[in-house]
């Protein structure tokens, strides 16, 4: 994750484009959370990248779509009493999510082709943006692969595929955000000496793991479990955390264990961030920003858990995780600039 040596000078148009793409990903993540929490994701049973742009418009078309939905496990086991009006609401949420995905893809692709044609991008950037375009395509396929897992024999999607879908979004967001930072943040004014960047890589790694764990929590509906804290309550203990055999399967299949790990990692990130600020004395704006976002995210997470995963709170919790990740990348970028400035001053 060397984001300093690859600095690029690009025109203002490219900077604005990258910023818009990053915002587009964040909106997608937020809408994706709403789609999952309203149980809308399985309402569209086919994947038509081109024809799927057009929603049903007549009553006959809507009935045809509902008949397809009636063949799904979700309808058979959970929503068998759903009315056509209720089905339309679910369908349109999933439709909007897919449509927004197409729009974000085009918002990236069309300006990319334009800037490449106008020779506004270096060869290195062109190669990296081709990778991003490929990942966006893969993300579309992954989204359908995830949905398909809930159309066969279970009324819910695979939590593994859900996690992969979210991680692909994170990878795309990281690449876009990294290049935006490289194009915007070149110089800094403070002169703090930072000799070691290991702690910042640790923070980024833990946030990435935490986002993955959060996806598993969502996929396993772990947020709806008992609010008793393991080891601090007589109701939840070691046997509940490790009841699946072999024991390591609990890490990604046991909702109680996954939720517990999610909480532990959150506290660990907070402790490391506070130590970095107070003990290592990395008192710079990006560090304060990270800590503020971390406190906001912890508050959102606690409220989401206490109030049994309300849709808006849980969706905000999901998108704030990406913003927190972005702030950690910004922090690392800033620290590396500090190191370069320190070396230049010595010379």
UniProtKB/Swiss-Prot annotation:
Root EC class = oxidoreductase
Please name the pathway: Porphyrin-containing compound metabolism; heme A biosynthesis; heme A from heme O: step 1/1
One Gene Ontology term of the molecular function aspect: oxidoreductase activity, acting on NAD(P)H, heme protein as acceptor
List of residues binding heme:
262, 317
Q: Which cellular components does GO assign to this protein?
A: plasma membrane
Q: Which positions, given as ranges, span the membrane?
A: 14-34, 96-116, 129-149, 162-182, 199-219, 260-280, 287-307, 311-331
Q: What is its EC number?
A: 1.17.99.9
Q: Which reaction does it catalyse?
A: Fe(II)-heme o + 2 A + H2O = Fe(II)-heme a + 2 AH2
InterPro entries attached to this UniProt entry: COX15/CtaA_fam, HemeA_Synthase_type2
| Entry keywords, A to Z | Cell membrane, Heme biosynthesis, Iron, Membrane, Metal-binding, Oxidoreductase, Transmembrane, Transmembrane helix
Q: Which GO terms describe its biological process?
A: heme A biosynthetic process
A single Pfam family, by name?
Answer: COX15-CtaA
Would the keyword Metal-binding turn up in this protein's UniProt record? yes
Coiled coil stretches, renumbered: none
The entry's localization annotation reads: Cell membrane
**The keyword Manganese is annotated on this UniProt entry:** no
Q: Which cofactor does it need?
A: heme b
Q: How does it sit in the membrane?
A: Multi-pass membrane protein
Principal localization reads membrane
Family in the record: Belongs to the COX15/CtaA family. Type 2 subfamily.
Record-linked PANTHER family: CYTOCHROME C OXIDASE ASSEMBLY PROTEIN COX15, CYTOCHROME C OXIDASE ASSEMBLY PROTEIN COX15 HOMOLOG
What is its biological role?
Catalyzes the conversion of heme O to heme A by two successive hydroxylations of the methyl group at C8. The first hydroxylation forms heme I, the second hydroxylation results in an unstable dihydroxymethyl group, which spontaneously dehydrates, resulting in the formyl group of heme A.
Q: How does it assemble?
A: Interacts with CtaB.
Q: What is this protein called?
A: Heme A synthase
């Amino acid at each position: 994750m060397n984001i300093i040596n690859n600095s690029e000078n690009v025109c203002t148009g490219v900077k604005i484009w990258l910023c818009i793409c990053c915002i587009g990903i964040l909106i997608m993540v937020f809408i994706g959370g709403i789609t999952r929490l309203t149980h809308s994701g399985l309402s569209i049973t086919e994947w038509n990248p081109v024809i799927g742009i057009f929603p049903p418009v007549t009553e006959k078309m809507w009935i045809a779509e509902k008949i397809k939905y009636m063949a799904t496990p979700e309808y058979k086991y959970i929503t068998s009493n759903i009315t056509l009006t209720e089905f339309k609401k679910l369908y349109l949420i999933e439709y909007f999510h897919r449509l927004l995905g197409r729009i974000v893809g085009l918002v990236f692709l069309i300006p990319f082709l334009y800037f490449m044609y106008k020779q506004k991008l270096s060869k290195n950037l062109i190669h990296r943006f081709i990778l991003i375009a490929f990942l966006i395509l893969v993300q579309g396929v992954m989204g359908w692969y995830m949905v398909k897992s809930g159309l066969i024999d279970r009324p819910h999607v695979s939590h593994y595929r859900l996690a992969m879908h979210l991680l692909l979004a994170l990878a795309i967001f990281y690449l876009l955000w990294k290049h935006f930072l490289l194009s915007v943040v070149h110089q800094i004014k403070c002169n703090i000496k930072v000799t070691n960047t290991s702690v910042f890589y640790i923070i980024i790694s833990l946030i990435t793991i935490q986002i993955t764990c959060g996806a598993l929590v969502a996929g396993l509906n772990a947020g709806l479990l008992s609010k008793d804290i393991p080891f601090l309550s007589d109701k939840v203990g070691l046997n509940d955390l490790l009841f699946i055999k072999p024991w390591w399967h609990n890490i990604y299949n046991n909702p109680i264990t996954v939720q517990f790990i999610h909480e532990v990692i959150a506290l660990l990130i907070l402790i490391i961030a506070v130590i970095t600020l107070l003990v290592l004395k990395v008192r710079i704006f990006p560090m304060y920003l990270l800590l503020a976002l971390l406190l906001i995210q912890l508050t959102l997470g606690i409220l989401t858990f206490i109030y049994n995963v309300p849709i808006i709170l849980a969706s905000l919790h999901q998108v704030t995780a990406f913003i927190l990740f972005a702030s950690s990348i910004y922090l690392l970028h800033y620290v590396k600039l500090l190191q370069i400035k320190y070396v230049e001053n010595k010379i």
